[in-house]
Each structure stands twice: as structure tokens, then as C-alpha cells.
Amino acid sequence: MLACVCLNPSFDRTVSLRSFTVGDVNRVLSARQDVGGKGINVAITARRLGIASCVLGCAGKNGIDAVRRKLDGEQVTHVFLPVDGDVRTNMKIVPQDGTGVTELNEPGAPVNAANQRAFSDLLAEKTVAGQYVVLTGSLPPECPPEYYRDLMLSLPERLFVLDVSGAALMAGLAARPFLVKPNRSELQAAMNRPLPTMADVHQAALELLEMGAQNVLVSLGGEGALWVSERGAMFAPAIPVRVQSTVGAGDAMVGGVMAGLEKTGDVRHALAYGAAAGCASVMTEGTQLIRPDDFAALLPQVQIQDV
């Protein structure tokens, strides 16, 4: 079973407009709300692709029942530690004129030191040696950037996948995660330099290996995805599809990769699964997750290239 950690779940509200003007009244064309959080998105994606998944996390007492109902409906098992506060609401403003998505993200309910210790115990209890465990998403208030690193160091027999950015990513590399998955922007921030070419991205991924990562998957949006390890590198070009929304595409890619690893144990197949899932994700509106039929149609079109 795939385990996904979600310490900061959310209600993701997506509004669509013809255009968005700061400082003016903007008329909404449509709106929808989904239960979100990167760990939740990864788990649901993997489950829709046939992989048994569970979510382990913390959630504000106000709203936790709605999160649980969503996961029950997706047949994803879950254990949440209730904490004081509300499940946060994130707003995604999507103009139809192509000017880009604006996101307004609340910080979430604080997870204090006692909660952190309790969750560490929960993760040890609910996972086993050799199991894939995905650590992803923003850390809630009061959680230090080293928290993911400390979880990994406390359970070295697990196969951790780290999909975070900034200080949490840099700290986490010391625990030698099985896989890290930055996008280009996150990788540029980690390297503190621009990475305009594929060669630049490849070199930066190699540097992450030197810092501790065992495998690096860089998601490159409409270009595709690059997998780098000590054994070599592979590139999966993006499949041309009609893009409805790019929100959650990175989570879908991670969910697809994990489904591929769980089913085959082969990183080449896992990259193909991730590429197909990421492309399937952008075919859905707002924060909706992938449709299995879209994934099944796209998977045979993925062409993995050795780099």
C-alpha cells in the first residue's frame, strides 16, 4: 500500500473568469470546491490507477469530517490527528484570457511540537520497512523546515519520496530520500541560478544527487519530465493535449509515478506512468483529478528517451 503524508489539507476553491483585474470588481463565470492537499491528491491519483493508498496526516478539527468523507468516497484509507483550528481554504483564480492562475493559500491549522511527536509515532506505527511513503505539501504553522528530514531519519527503512520546495527540500536531502521531485522553478531556487536549457536542468539534478537524493524527477510542464539517477537519465516528452488547467499536474505526476513503481518496480515504467498522469491531469478543469480513461489513452503514447 502507498502511504501519503498530508499535514496541511485544504478546501481548494477554483473560480473561472473571463479576465482578472487587481483592484476592480471581477465577475465569476463558474466556481467549484474540492478537498485538496498534495498528499491527498497523490493518494487519490494512485488509487484511481488501481493502487491501494492511504493518507496519514493532521487536520483542523473544523472541516476534518469533510476531508474524511472525500477520501472514503475515493476508497482511500486514512488516519488523521485532529488539531485545533480550521482546515484551510485555498483560492485559485483562473482567467480565460491566458494571463495565468493566481493562487491565494491560507497557512492552515498550527501543528505544535506535541502534535509533531504524535504524528511521528503514527507514521512509524502505520508504515513498514520497504514501503513507499510520499512526503509532500507545505508544512503547517509551527512545523520547522527540518520536520520532513527528521521523519525520514527516524524511519530509514522506508522508501521516502520528497516533493517539497525551499528549505524543506534542502534539509530533506540529508536523509537520502529515494526520490525528490522539484519542478523547474523549485530546482532553480534550490540551485540559486536560472536553468534555461535541458542541459542546465540535467546538471542541477546531478547536483541534487550529490547532495543526497537517490533519484531526481524534474517536472517541466509542457516540455515533459526528466528522471536522473546514478544509473543515467531518461526524458519523457509531454503529450500534446488540450489544456484545461495545470493545477495539480505535479501531484498527478507523482501519483502516476508511484502507481508505476507499485505495479512494476521499474523506474522506466514509472516515468511513463507519471508522464501520462500529468498530461491527463491538465485535461480536467480546476482542481479535479485525473480520469482513468484519459490516462489509459495517453499511456501508450508516452515515448521515453534515454539522455
Regions found by a protein language model. Give the residues of each.
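Glycine-rich phosphate/adenosyl-contacting loop at the front of the ribokinase-like
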Residues: M1-L56, I64-A66
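General beta-strand structural signal in soluble alpha/beta enzymes
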Residues: C4-L7, G57, F80, V134-L135, ...
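Conserved N-terminal subdomain of the carbohydrate kinase-like
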Residues: D24, R48-Q131, A297-V307
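Short beta-strand scaffold segments in enzyme catalytic cores
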Residues: I44, M91-I93, G224-V228
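Short, conserved phosphate/pyrophosphate- and ester-handling motifs at nucleotide-, phospho-/glycolipid
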Residues: A46, N183, G250
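Short acidic, glycine-rich surface-loop motifs adjacent to enzyme active sites
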Residues: G130-P140
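Conserved phosphate/ATP/ADP-binding segment of small-molecule kinases
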Residues: P145-R231
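Conserved phosphate-binding/catalytic region of the ribokinase-like
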Residues: A171, M198-V307
